[in-house]
């Protein structure tokens, strides 16, 4: 055990990221296939995925209470799970990039969306929703937003995203964020 747990920590982190990717991909696939599914089938599958996210969240909580070296690396995943559970973000791709702390890819996605809006491939409402999500994620990752982006965010951020940002800033500590995410899961089940 000369690595003093570094190898194990690295492998655990990789496994957790893969699990989060799988769940986010499942949510994204579900949204893409929504038209092909009847309402009950869609709701049931979404409920199952949210339950899996909740179980994953519980696992993270147990890991964090026993292994403090993982706390910083897992905090991004926690916020992504919180966003997915509370449905603050509607776009699984944004959640995944946020969890992996990939601001460059978020900015690339934003540029692609702006282009798609200009050529008519993306509706304005969907563009606005996804742009707000991406800008909020970038802000939470500590990225500097332009004055135009800040103005866009102020004008278009909904109550749910504002609450997500406020809560994630105020709570800060992993246990409190997990407690809120757990509460949101319970609320979503009702």
Swiss-Prot record:
GO-annotated biological processes: response to ionizing radiation
InterPro entries from the UniProt entry: ICAT_dom (IPR009428), ICAT_sf (IPR036911)
Any GO MF annotation of the entry: beta-catenin binding
Keywords noted in UniProt: Coiled coil
Residues passing through the membrane, by range: none
Annotated coiled-coil segments of the chain: 2-63
Record bears the keyword Coiled coil: yes
UniProt entry tagged with the keyword Ribonucleoprotein: no
Similarity remark: Belongs to the CTNNBIP1 family.
Subunit text: Does not interact with CTNNB1.
Name by which UniProt lists this protein: Protein LZIC
């Amino acid at each position: 055990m000369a690595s003093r747990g570094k190898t194990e920590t690295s492998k655990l982190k990789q496994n957790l990221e893969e699990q989060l990717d799988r769940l986010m991909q499942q949510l994204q696939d579900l949204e893409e296939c929504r038209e092909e599914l009847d309402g009950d089938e869609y709701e049931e599958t979404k409920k199952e995925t949210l339950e899996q996210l909740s179980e994953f969240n519980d696992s993270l909580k147990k890991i964090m209470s026993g292994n403090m070296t993982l706390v910083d690396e897992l905090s991004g995943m926690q916020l992504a799970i919180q966003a997915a559970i509370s449905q603050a973000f509607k776009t699984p791709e944004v959640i995944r990039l946020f969890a992996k702390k990939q601001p460059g890819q978020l900015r690339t996605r934003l540029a692609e969306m702006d282009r798609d809006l200009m050529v008519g491939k993306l509706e304005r409402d969907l563009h606005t929703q996804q742009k707000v999500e991406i800008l909020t994620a970038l802000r939470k990752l500590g990225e500097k937003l332009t004055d135009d982006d800040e103005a866009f965010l102020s004008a278009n951020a909904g109550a749910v995203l504002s609450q997500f940002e406020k809560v994630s800033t105020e709570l800060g500590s992993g246990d409190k964020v997990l407690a809120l995410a757990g509460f949101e899961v319970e609320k979503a089940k009702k």
